[in-house]
């Protein structure tokens, strides 16, 4: 059965945790493992942070949009901004590549997303924005605790 959620918020760093928790609460209906839930929360944090810091250059007037569709045990997550866009997506997806070397932890966002999700697609157009499509299958059988 299909279920979906849509969320929009100002591109402010304090909204990153709101996005992460909201998506996690929605995905919880699939009864994911703690690892699966942590991975989804981490990916949301990375994608939203990229939109805020890189897409909008910390301009709080920008809007970040998130859509989550759950269907047949698969989470389809979309994070979209209408910011500056990415001129070279392939380069941006390289580990440790960053346009902001002065920031701690820079350059690992896409690498983290690729490690935690089953599929990551990035579409971007300069001066129009970026959309990140993420997909994760949630395991159907859970380990039993004795």
UniProtKB/Swiss-Prot annotation:
GO biological process, one term: asexual sporulation
Gene Ontology molecular functions: ATP binding; protein serine kinase activity; protein serine/threonine kinase activity; sigma factor antagonist activity
Pfam families: HATPase_c_2 (PF13581)
Enzyme Commission number(s) of this protein: 2.7.11.1
Swiss-Prot/TrEMBL catalytic activity: L-seryl-[protein] + ATP = O-phospho-L-seryl-[protein] + ADP + H(+); L-threonyl-[protein] + ATP = O-phospho-L-threonyl-[protein] + ADP + H(+)
InterPro entries for this protein: Anti-sigma-factor_SerPK (IPR050267), Anti-sigma_F (IPR010194), HATPase_C_sf (IPR036890)
Keywords: ATP-binding, Kinase, Nucleotide-binding, Serine/threonine-protein kinase, Sporulation, Transferase
TM region(s), chain numbering: none
Function according to Swiss-Prot or TrEMBL: Binds to sigma F and blocks its ability to form an RNA polymerase holoenzyme (E-sigma F). Phosphorylates SpoIIAA on a serine residue. This phosphorylation may enable SpoIIAA to act as an anti-anti-sigma factor that counteracts SpoIIAB and thus releases sigma F from inhibition.
Entry similarity comment: Belongs to the anti-sigma-factor family.
Name assigned to this protein: Anti-sigma F factor
Species of origin: Geobacillus kaustophilus (strain HTA426)
Lineage, top ranks: Bacteria, Bacillati, Bacillota, Bacilli, Bacillales
Gene name, Swiss-Prot/TrEMBL: spoIIAB
């Amino acid at each position: 059965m299909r279920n979906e959620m849509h969320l929009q918020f100002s591109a402010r760093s304090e909204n990153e945790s709101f996005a992460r928790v909201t998506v996690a609460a929605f995905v919880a209906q699939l009864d994911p493992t703690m690892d699966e839930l942590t991975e989804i929360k981490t990916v949301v944090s990375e994608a939203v942070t990229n939109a805020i810091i890189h897409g909008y250059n910390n301009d709080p007037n920008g809007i970040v949009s998130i859509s989550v569709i759950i269907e047949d045990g698969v989470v389809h997550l979309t994070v979209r901004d209408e910011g500056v866009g990415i001129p070279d997506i392939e380069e941006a997806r390289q580990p440790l590549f960053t346009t902001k070397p002065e920031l701690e932890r820079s350059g690992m966002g896409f690498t983290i997303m690729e490690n935690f999700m089953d599929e990551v697609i990035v579409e971007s157009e300069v001066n129009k924005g970026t959309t990140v499509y993420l997909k994760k299958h949630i395991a159907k059988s859970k380990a039993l605790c004795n």
